[in-house]
UniProtKB/Swiss-Prot annotation:
The lineage of its organism: Bacteria, Bacillati, Bacillota, Bacilli, Lactobacillales. Its cofactor is Mg(2+); Mn(2+). Homodimer. Gene3D superfamilies: Isopropylmalate Dehydrogenase. It comes from Streptococcus pneumoniae (strain ATCC BAA-255 / R6). GO terms for biological process: L-leucine biosynthetic process. The gene is leuB. Binds 1 Mg(2+) or Mn(2+) ion per subunit. Catalyzes the oxidation of 3-carboxy-2-hydroxy-4-methylpentanoate (3-isopropylmalate) to 3-carboxy-4-methyl-2-oxopentanoate. The product decarboxylates to 4-methyl-2 oxopentanoate. Belongs to the isocitrate and isopropylmalate dehydrogenases family. LeuB type 1 subfamily. GO terms for molecular function: 3-isopropylmalate dehydrogenase activity; magnesium ion binding; NAD binding. This is 3-isopropylmalate dehydrogenase. NAD(+) binds at residues 274-286. The record marks 139, 184 as: Important for catalysis. SUPFAM superfamilies: Isocitrate/Isopropylmalate dehydrogenase-like.
Length: 345
């Protein structure tokens, strides 16, 4: 039976790089027999422009029934400061699908080391994953703004913490088997719970080493010794900040994918960068982050490990051959980058 993939086409450069990702998927399917169907839907500003809500009911229904979801950048300056914004649709989708675990791999391509703001010897061997709890804590607590006082409620249950930490340990089992749990347990009650749960979950994974870091120390280590990390797991707010910090290590957002997983429903895969409206429609956007998001989908949702390695090798050899888009120091167009990768499948 064909796998159903919903493609949520966003704003700015979104349509261009989504098509590049889907063309690579199509080329792979022709070689391997992967059976799938694509349900393309506008998302983000396009929905709002059509006088609709940021997350239409039919889009939510299709997403719930899908085997996997591909999403590309949303947002535009025209929605800044207005009541209805594209980002509200994404937040609602995460909540409705219970996408509790955000997975962001950080790996430096050898051929792109020169882009990093850190010295080559400092980023050598960097290959870690940030696992961020995505649906709880202060972002989803009550937000109370008064005339001269404000409160944001930080709230976590045992179950919310347990499932995200368990996810991190499961990922670590297939890597270097080190989990670094990041908290602020010397100050915050939620972090005291976080550390307690981490210690308890670790008992179920005797083959995996658990380490603890306070968030301020972790932020420093991510710059001074990033190769130390294997799997980082942390709460929503800390994860938001640290995952963005980690993205700087590569020197470009154009090659970084991410995934958001639920417990039982479909997962969502997307590049980490924005919609880049300043270059939209010019055919120069880097499609690699979208293509690598497709890679994560093939691996995590469909278990097609050989296919994922095939695309990753094609990306790496294309970069090593000097085929680079403008954001990473070359002159290749979106189409030329995509075609180079397809040719190397």
């Amino acid at each position: 039976m064909a796998k159903k993939i919903v493609a949520l086409v966003g704003d700015g450069i979104g349509p261009e790089i989504m098509e590049a990702g889907l063309e690579v998927l199509e080329a792979l399917a022709e070689k391997t027999g992967f059976d799938y169907e694509i349900d393309r839907r506008p998302f983000g500003g396009a929905d709002i422009d059509a006088a609709g809500p940021p997350l239409p009911d039919e889009t939510l229904k299709a997403s719930r029934e899908a085997d996997a979801i591909l999403l590309v950048a949303i947002g535009s300056p025209q929605y800044d400061g207005v009541a209805v914004r594209p980002e509200q649709g994404l937040m609602a989708l995460r909540k409705e699908l219970n996408l509790y675990a955000n997975i962001r791999p950080v790996k430096i391509f050898d051929s792109l080391k020169y882009l990093s703001p850190l010295k080559p010897e400092r980023i050598s061997g960097v290959d870690f994953v940030v696992v961020r709890e995505l649906t709880g804590e202060i972002y989803f607590g009550d937000h109370i703004l008064e005339e001269r006082k404000a409160r944001d409620i930080n709230d976590y249950s045992y179950e919310e913490v347990e499932r995200i930490i368990r996810k991190a340990f499961e990922i670590a089992r297939n890597r270097r088997k080190i989990v670094t749990s990041i908290d602020k347990q010397n100050v915050l009650a939620t972090s005291k719970l976080w550390r307690k749960v981490a210690e308890e979950v670790a008992q179920d994974f005797p083959d995996v080493t658990l380490e603890h870091q306070l968030v301020d120390s972790a932020a420093m280590l991510m710059i001074t010794n990033p190769a130390k990390f294997d799997v980082i797991v942390t709460e929503n707010l800390f994860g938001d900040i640290l995952s963005d910090e980690s993205s700087v290590l590569s020197g470009t957002l154009g090659v970084m994918p991410s995934a958001s997983h639920s417990e039982n429903g479909p997962s969502l895969y997307e590049p980490i960068h924005g919609s880049a409206p300043d270059i939209a429609g010019q055919g120069i956007a880097n499609p690699i982050s979208m293509i690598l998001s497709v890679v994560m989908m093939l691996r995590d949702s469909f278990g097609r490990y050989e296919d994922t390695e095939r695309i990753k090798r094609a990306v790496e050899t294309s970069l090593a051959a000097g085929i680079l888009t403008r954001d990473i120091g070359g002159q290749a167009s979106t189409k030329e980058m995509m075609e180079a990768i397809i040719a190397r499948l």
